UniProtKB/Swiss-Prot annotation:
Identification of the protein by name: Heat-inducible transcription repressor HrcA
Signal peptide, first to last residue: none
GN (gene name): hrcA
Superkingdom, taxonomy of origin: Bacteria
Keywords attached to this entry: Repressor, Stress response, Transcription, Transcription regulation
Claim: Transcription is one of the keywords in the record: yes
GO annotation (BP), single: negative regulation of DNA-templated transcription
Keyword Transcription appears in the UniProt entry: yes
Gene3D superfamilies (UniProt xref): 3.30.450.40, Heat-inducible transcription repressor hrca homolog, domain 3, Winged helix-like DNA-binding domain superfamily/Winged helix DNA-binding domain
Amino acid sequence: MVKPLRLNDRHQQILRATVQHYIATAEPVGSHTLAQEYQFAVSSATIRNALGQLEKAGLLYQPHVSAGRVPSDSGYRIYVDNLLTWSDRQSRTVKQRLENEINGDNWHFEALIQRMGQILAGLSGYIALITFPQTETVQLRHLQLMLLPSHQILIILVTDSYHTHSATLDLPAAMEAKEEGELEQELAIFSNFLNAQLRGKNLSELSHLNWQELDQKFSIYADFLKGLQQQIKPLLQRRMAGPLVVHGVSKVIQQPEFSQLEQVQMLLSLLEQEQDKLFSLLFDPDNYGDNLANLGQEMNLLTGETMPKTRPVVTIRIGAENPLESMHPCTLVSAIYRQQEIPMGSVSILGPTRMVYQQTIPLVEQAAECLSEALSKN
């Protein structure tokens, strides 16, 4: 059973050193190695005791009994959120390097995306994934709510391309005692209200819609509205999108984490056959700014240094935080690029959880900023 552990300075230092050493070597880390290579000013036995406490807390684990420790997904999460820092100067250096690689040429944007993918794969050693700008999006044409005998509400959604989607949601508890005729009349009124609010809107516009204001106008439908939002989003995400730019696969499959054929096959299947699932994960504006890793809020807890809010928000999903099982051995680092505050696409790097986070995160952040600046000039 995992026991909670309040990390003191020593725990933080040993966890940071363990993660960094494992990232660099891909070899389990023992107390003797840490005592020799890092200046902790404590004995090997003290380090060994701290490693045991970190393991009990679920931040490290042993691949087998006689081995050293390696970071768990939770260990990487603590490392990324609390122990990893970099300065504005480092970010400026990364951006300058990207601009030098692009050579300041007057690229067409599609060619720039291809080139940026090559650069990110080359600099990181991982897979670069960039979505093309989403200029054409599916819009909601009509919404209808119907009462079912099972005290559920049938939602029928029709897009501007006349694609139909249906789903059921539970009737709000506050309405269960009402008569059937009264319910049907109220649902008709609510349907008309929702059509007036949502008709003609695409996913980007719905993402910026004040759903809280809708909750206030029809407070008894608050939970229903949350469910409705989740039903609408996947439908409107079926975009008329350009191809997903993918570079760097050959480098990643050389990593020790992908030494087994089955692991390589799962990764290739994800990139070749599950792009629809991957696309919705890469480009969902609502996912950026959630609690997965809002850099500028959580990255510098130890130093107190904050990042400018104007930077692209970088989302980091580590291991099992990824909803697709084929991505559980991986970390996905993503940021949205924009045109005048409108989300247009995303820049991502996909690699093993044993990722050089200190290098990868600024790369994604600054690549998104470069693409946003390029779009603003068009």
